[in-house]
């Protein structure tokens, strides 16, 4: 049951050991680590599909087919982030610091444990492991003041949210007498009495998950962290980390708040609406492409929360499918920027992509496909994700959520189209020659293929 987590932890620690011992061989060790991480995917697919439970006087840890799928998807995006860091270090001429790969792997271990946790305290500890490594990943560029500033904001706000989360756990134990998901589920759904203290405890605990999702109003850290963090860290935060947070939320939703108390339901609904509003409007005035993508993430997390609020199996599937499609599109966009700008990617803005279509037609076309998918143009995968999500919302008579989703999608189309306009209709002062990176090229090829043909594969 714990084989994927054990394998990943050993891979991280042993790889770091060999990276220290074999000075100057970091790139070789990185390639071996990536191969071992790919092996972990096969371990997940082979040994984690059957339902099993770990007991330590009570249920602490569980796995099943859904959880195994989540872990496999997260690990795929983790591997992509590792490849991006490896190739970016080559293109930028910076030395490959193996600690980065170790931190990403340990963060993923925390996500894995959190997804399988059946106890609030275990879930908190797992999320803290992910949070602590994420703070370091955000501030990994020690020479960059913006990186340090973003990491410091991330750490301070994250620490505050962790305190709220622990405060919520104390409420849960005090009013519920247990930290087990199953026990709290029973008490929350006991129609004979409404335990307001228990509801408050759950809501306080959920604040840590909403912070990790960068959903409004807990989103203010995201633009600064995205702007200052290394591009490989940003890809990890946008894809693997966000998918993990959504999986944790769906796990809690299934076991604890399937029948929402009105307080928690309305609170999550407000968070979804605020995320859509802040995400759509906040991105309009941005000039930095990384800050723009931070607001885009906030907006799209609002869409994901629509699926969570529906409280149905189809709603959960719609939420995770949409998150997967958005994560793939974001990865594709960032890899295009790296291929185009090299060591200037971390300072990418609209001026950086002016007129690139004239000299770099393939990259411009790839970005076009990605932007159209984010807008939701058929028959791209982004259209399928939005259609499925909004259709489920309308079916469940959540008209306000659906209307807000459609309205903010129209607003978001403005800045996605602005990127396309800048590439094709602005003049590029000095054309640059781009060296080929086969790792990034392969990632982009897979992403574009998924966005183009994913809707046909998924619908069939």
Curated annotation (Swiss-Prot):
Any matching Pfam family: Proton_antipo_M
Alphabetical list of HAMAP family matching this protein: NDH1_NuoN_1
Transmembrane segments: 2-22, 28-48, 65-85, 104-124, 155-175, 196-216, 230-250, 263-283, 292-312, 321-341, 363-383, 400-420, 438-458
Keywords from the named record: Cell inner membrane, Cell membrane, Membrane, NAD, Quinone, Translocase, Transmembrane, Transmembrane helix, Transport, Ubiquinone
EC number: 7.1.1.-
PANTHER family: NADH DEHYDROGENASE
Gene Ontology annotations of biological process type: ATP synthesis coupled electron transport
Family as reported in the entry's similarity comment: Belongs to the complex I subunit 2 family.
Record's protein name: NADH-quinone oxidoreductase subunit N
Subunit structure: NDH-1 is composed of 14 different subunits. Subunits NuoA, H, J, K, L, M, N constitute the membrane sector of the complex.
Top-rank taxon, per record: Bacteria
Localisation per UniProt entry: Cell inner membrane
Catalytic reaction annotation: a quinone + NADH + 5 H(+)(in) = a quinol + NAD(+) + 4 H(+)(out)
A GO MF label: NADH:ubiquinone reductase (non-electrogenic) activity
GO (cellular component) term, any one: plasma membrane
Broadest EC class assigned to this enzyme: translocase
InterPro entries according to UniProt: NADH-Q_OxRdtase_suN/2, ND/Mrp_TM
Function summary: NDH-1 shuttles electrons from NADH, via FMN and iron-sulfur (Fe-S) centers, to quinones in the respiratory chain. The immediate electron acceptor for the enzyme in this species is believed to be ubiquinone. Couples the redox reaction to proton translocation (for every two electrons transferred, four hydrogen ions are translocated across the cytoplasmic membrane), and thus conserves the redox energy in a proton gradient.
Membrane topology, record value: Multi-pass membrane protein
């Amino acid at each position: 049951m714990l084989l994927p987590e054990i394998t990943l932890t050993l891979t991280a620690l042993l790889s770091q050991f060999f990276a220290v011992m074999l000075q100057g061989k970091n790139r070789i060790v990185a390639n071996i680590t990536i191969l071992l991480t790919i092996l972990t995917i096969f371990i997940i697919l082979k040994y984690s599909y059957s339902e099993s439970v770990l007991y330590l006087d009570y249920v602490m840890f569980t796995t099943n087919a859904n959880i195994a799928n989540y872990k496999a998807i997260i690990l795929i995006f983790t591997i992509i982030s590792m490849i991006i860091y490896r190739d970016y270090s080559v293109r930028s001429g910076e030395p490959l610091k193996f600690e980065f790969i170790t931190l990403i792997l340990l963060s993923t271990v925390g996500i894995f444990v959190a997804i399988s946790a059946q106890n609030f305290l275990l879930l908190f500890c797992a999320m803290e492991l992910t949070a602590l490594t994420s703070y370091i990943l955000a501030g990994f560029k020690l020479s960059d003041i913006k990186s340090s500033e973003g990491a410091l904001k991330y750490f301070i706000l994250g620490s505050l949210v962790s305190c709220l989360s622990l405060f919520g756990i104390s409420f849960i134990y005090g009013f519920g007498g247990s930290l087990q998901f199953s026990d709290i589920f029973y008490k929350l759904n006991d129609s004979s009495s409404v335990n307001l203290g228990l509801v408050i405890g759950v809501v306080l605990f959920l604040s840590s998950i909403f912070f990790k999702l960068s959903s409004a109003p807990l989103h203010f850290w995201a633009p600064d962290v995205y702007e200052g963090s290394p591009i490989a860290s940003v890809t990890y935060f946008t894809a693997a980390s966000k998918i993990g947070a959504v999986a944790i939320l769906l796990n809690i939703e299934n076991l604890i708040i399937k029948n929402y108390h009105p307080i928690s339901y309305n609170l999550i609904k407000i968070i979804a609406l605020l995320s859509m509003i802040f995400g759509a409007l906040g991105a309009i005035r941005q000039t930095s492409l990384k800050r723009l993508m931070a607001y885009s993430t906030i907006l799209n997390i609002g869409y994901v929360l629509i699926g969570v609020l529906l409280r149905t199996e189809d709603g959960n599937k719609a939420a995770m499918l949409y998150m997967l499609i958005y994560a793939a599109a974001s990865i594709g966009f960032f890899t295009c920027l790296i291929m185009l700008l090299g060591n200037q990617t971390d300072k990418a803005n609209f001026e950086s992509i002016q007129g690139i279509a004239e000299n770099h037609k393939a990259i411009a076309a790839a970005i076009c496909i990605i932007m159209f998918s984010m807008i939701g143009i058929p028959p791209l995968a982004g259209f399928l994700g939005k259609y499925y999500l909004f259709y489920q919302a309308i079916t469940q008579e959540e008209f306000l959520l659906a209307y807000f989703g459609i309205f903010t999608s129209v607003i978001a189309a403005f800045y996605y189209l602005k990127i396309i306009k800048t590439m094709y209709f602005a003049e590029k002062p000095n054309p640059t020659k781009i060296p080929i990176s086969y790792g990034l090229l392969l990632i982009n090829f897979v992403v574009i293929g998924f966005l183009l043909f994913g809707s046909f594969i998924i619908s069939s």
